[in-house]
Amino acid sequence: MLKVGIVGASGYVGLELTRILLRHPQVDKLYLFSDHFEDSWVFKSEKIFITDRSTYSELYKDLDVVFFALGSGETLGFLSKGEIPERFIDMSADFRFKNPGEYERVYGIKHNMPEILEKVVYGLPEIFRDKIKGAQYIANPGCYPTASLLGLFPLIKNNLTYGNAIIDAKSGISGAGRKPTDKSIYGNIAENYQAYSILNHRHQPEIENVIKEIGYLRVLFVPQLIPVFRGMFVSIYVPLRDEITSEDLYQIFKEVYEDEYFIKVLPPSCSPEIKKVRGTNWAVISAQADKNTKNAVILVAIDNLIKGAAGQAIQNMNIMFGFAESLGLDFLPLYP
């Protein structure tokens, strides 16, 4: 049985980690490190110990794994004191780039722990499972990269695409985090739809960096906010090398993902729906081929807080410790 810590338990991702780990059959103790945990009444349980971050230095050596649910730069600040747990899974972008210079360019933060980067594995199980099995440290992917890479992977793996991929990505407002901003307040998000960080979103370099490990493709990425709380819908348009039908694509995607518990591949005429992945660790995908332009249209829906964050992190934990990947994650959507 595991003793698990969550640093930054009061944000949306930290709360999701807490909710899911609380019902995980292999988690015995759950330590929540937060300086302002206002939701303690929600999580009354003998499993849970709520404390402030200052006690981390006293407890971290006794924990089997620690989840860092902090903002960019904050995990670095936390770990740079030398208090590095035996295993950690980081939800921020602090360890997603192997090149510290690339991280500094994208996030404007100096990386002060380059010696750790070589030991960190990018935690997208459907692509890097074998590396995750022996990993000590995991960088959990961003939500947009998770959906985008799962959509592109079968084509890249089979060398079926080239050139430029257009990724048109829409996210619920929870992706912006719990701290309110002008864009996230109800009056601005309700009955509204807007793009943001056009052509300079920080997840674009992350997507491109991972693609370099498995193939080659340039990316044009435009994210948008939609008036829902949780959920992500990504539409990908990418050229095809050969004459391929929608049925061909369907069979290719099914073959690549046939053993993946959390990937659902739909027939060509179907579209994923945000509502049908809400509250799950699923990624639902459909792919179609347009014979006029020789482009593929790939559609992906995930819950940005679960498969795009907390659920995927727990999936990584399961792999790390040799548990079944679906352990503690086998729930159905919040539907209707």
Swiss-Prot record:
Q: Which GO terms describe its biological process?
A: L-arginine biosynthetic process
Compartmental location = Cytoplasm
Spell out the reaction equation it catalyses: N-acetyl-L-glutamate 5-semialdehyde + phosphate + NADP(+) = N-acetyl-L-glutamyl 5-phosphate + NADPH + H(+)
For this UniProt record, the keywords arranged alphabetically read as follows: Amino-acid biosynthesis, Arginine biosynthesis, Cytoplasm, NADP, Oxidoreductase
Which principal EC class is assigned to this enzyme? oxidoreductase
Catalytic residues at: 143
Listed pathway(s): Amino-acid biosynthesis; L-arginine biosynthesis; N(2)-acetyl-L-ornithine from L-glutamate: step 3/4
**Which PANTHER family does the UniProt entry name for this protein?**
N-ACETYL-GAMMA-GLUTAMYL-PHOSPHATE REDUCTASE, CHLOROPLASTIC-RELATED (PTHR32338:SF10), N-ACETYL-GAMMA-GLUTAMYL-PHOSPHATE REDUCTASE, CHLOROPLASTIC-RELATED-RELATED (PTHR32338)
Q: Which NCBIfam families match?
A: argC (TIGR01850)
What this protein is called in its record is N-acetyl-gamma-glutamyl-phosphate reductase
Q: Which organism is it from?
A: Dictyoglomus turgidum (strain DSM 6724 / Z-1310)
Gene that specifies this protein: argC
